Amino acid sequence: MKKPPLYKSLYAQVIVAIIIGVLLGHFLPETGTAMKPLGDGFIKLIKMIIAPVIFCTVVIGIAGMEDMKKVGKTGGLALLYFEVMSTVALLVGLIIVNVLQPGAGMNVDVSTLDTASLASYTAPGKLETVTEFAMHIIPMSMIDAFAKGDVLQVLLVSVLFGFALQKLGGRGTLVFDFIEKISHVLFTIVGFIMRAAPVGAFGAMAFTIGKYGISSLLSLGKLMGAFYLTCLFFIFVVLGIVTRLHGFSIWKFVKYIKEELLIVLGTSSSESVLPRMIAKMENMGAKKSVVGLVIPTGYSFNLDGTAIYLTMAAVFIAQATNTPMSLMQQVTLLAVLLLTSKGAAGITGSGFIVLAATLSAVGHVPVAGLALILGIDRFMSEARALTNTIGNGVATLVVAKWVGDLDMDKLHAELDNESPQAADQPEKILDQTNTKLGA
C-alpha cells in the first residue's frame, strides 16, 4: 500500500502547526495570545462528541456480550490496575523529587508571594469526600449526564443501558442496530473534527507561548526538568516493564499512537484524543466491551502523569519554602493524593486545582507556595497529558489481555504496521466489528 504524501499526514501537519504556534507566540506575543479561541474551539468540538461516543461504544460492547459476569470482572480488574499504577506513579514522583530536590536552595519567603491569582484555585469546598465523589457520579437525570458531559456520569448511564439492552435479548435488536448505526455517524464526525487538529494545536501553543513566554521556563527549569525526566522514566521504565510482561513493546506502542500524542502535546489535554484512542485500541485487537469500560474510566481513575505531578509539585513547594516534611507527613500526603487525584479529569489545568485543594486539606505545605509554579503549570501540563494518554492506552491492552479479550496477533500486526489504519479514519473500526446482540 502506497504511503500518502508527508504533507497529508496528520502527524506532519500537527508538528508544523506546533512549531508555527511557538514562533508566533514568541515573536508576536499579543497576536499569539489572540489565537486562544482556536485551541479552545477545537477542545469544545471534541468535548461535544465525547459523551455520545462513550455511550455508543459502551452500550454496543456490553449488549453484545453473552457473559455478563465478564463485564463485572473487567471493571474490577481495571480498577485494581488503576489503583496499583496510580500508587506507583505517586511513589515514583515522591522518590525522585526527594532525590533530585529541585526546590532546595531557593529559600523563598512565603509572605512575599503574590497569592491574589490563587483565589480561584483555593476556594473552600474544592475537595470532595469519598461519599461526595460517589454521589457526584449519579446524575440528576439521564439527560443531565449528557448535558454536563461528565464522563463518569455518562459511563454510569451507558453501563446501565447496555445491561438493560442485553437483558432484552432479541427484543432489543432494533435498538442495538440503531445505536450501532449512530456509532458510524459519530466516528465519521470525529474524523471531520480531527482534520482541524493542526489548527487547534497551533492556537493553543501560540497562546501558551504568547501569554507566559519561553523565558518563564528558565526561572523554574529545574522543577520542569525533573518532572519531564520523571515522566519519561515512568513511561519507558515502569510502563515499559508492564508492557514487556504482557507481550508487547512500549516503544512500538508510543510510535503507534504518535499522532494522538502530538495532538495532546498541542492542546495539553488528554481528553482531546479520547475518541481516537477508543478507535486505536479496538484496531489493536482489544474488544469493544473492554475499551468502552477502561478508556473512559481511566480519565478519572488512571491519571499517571497527574499523580507524578501532584507529589513532585507538593514536595517542591515544601523544599523551596524551607518547610520541613517528615516521612510520616509525606506518607499522609501520598494517602490523601490517592483519593484527590481521582478528581483530576483529563482537562487542561485540573491537576493544579486538585493540588491546591489537597494542600489546603493536608496543611503541611503552605498553599501560598502554589504561586511559585502557577506560571509554569501550563508548560508542565503537556507532560501530564502525554503520560496520562499513554498510561490509559497501556491499561486498556493489559486489562484486555487479563480477561482474554486481546487478539495478540492483531496487536503485533498493528504495532509492526508503519501506517495504522485507524490514524485518519477511526470510523473504519466499526466496519471491522461484527458485534451481535446477546441472546
Curated annotation (Swiss-Prot):
Coiled-coil segments: none
GO cellular component: plasma membrane
Top-level lineage group: Bacteria
Keyword tags: Cell inner membrane, Cell membrane, Membrane, Symport, Transmembrane, Transmembrane helix, Transport
Residue ranges crossing the lipid bilayer per the database entry: 9-29, 45-65, 77-97, 145-165, 185-205, 223-243, 290-310, 332-352, 353-373
Stretches for region Disordered: 417-439
One Gene Ontology term of the molecular function aspect: succinate transmembrane transporter activity
Subcellular location: Cell inner membrane
Membrane topology: Multi-pass membrane protein
PANTHER family: AEROBIC C4-DICARBOXYLATE TRANSPORT PROTEIN, PROTON/GLUTAMATE-ASPARTATE SYMPORTER
Stated role: Responsible for the transport of dicarboxylates such as succinate, fumarate, and malate from the periplasm across the membrane.
Protein name: C4-dicarboxylate transport protein
Source organism of the structure: Janthinobacterium sp. (strain Marseille) (Minibacterium massiliensis)
Name of the gene this protein is made from: dctA
